[in-house]
Amino acid sequence: GVSPLEMASAYGTLANGGTYIEPTIFTTISSYDGQLIVKNTPEEHRVVDPEVAYVLTDMLQAVVTEGTGGRAALSNGIPVAGKTGTTNKSLDAWFVGYTPYYVGATYLGDDAGRKDSNGNTISRKGISGGSSSAAKLWSTVMNKIHKNLTKTDFKVPKNIYFTKINLIDGGRSSSGSNAAFIKGTGPSRYSSRPSRPSQSEEDTNQNQQNTTPETPTTPETPTTPET
């Protein structure tokens, strides 16, 4: 399996503009009189281009502002990018997210379960609220950490531009949602569809969301957590 630390480290790569930084539990060790004994310099290397990392960050912000990760939003308005994840019957619930300051991962699950006479796990208890509960736990912790920090946005690389698109078919639309693109990769055609789904489409999507829980995905080693 994948640990919360590994997930936080992967998402940390996105938060750091595409650079992976090895997680560490300390930065320096000093003597009682302030002399430096050990300086812990973590390994770091570029994994993806800054522009690619930002486009993913832009997408993941939408998970919090208008998707399944709404409960991860911070009370002071500092932007959050992240993703929820659940397994079948909500036996496991995740939220991994980051801000311009920190990255963190929350996991909720019944690791003990009900066992038979031989000690084998035969059933596990589902998580009430699923990934929404994991997102809420994330914001509860992060609200305290970000309490006195200044609101700031994620840094936008120079080769990124924004245009409005129709979320249904991906075409350009003056009444659509703003989305980030790398220069030269944005949509050239205009959408011929309404920017919002019809009521019947919304009902269908809602039914699908209620019956098919999302599956957590492991990002391609995308912020290195600050500890």
Regions found by a protein language model. Give the residues of each.
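A penicillin-recognizing enzyme superfamily signal
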Residues: 1-192
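Proline/serine/threonine-rich low-complexity "mucin-like" segments in extracytoplasmic/periplasmic regions
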Residues: 178-227
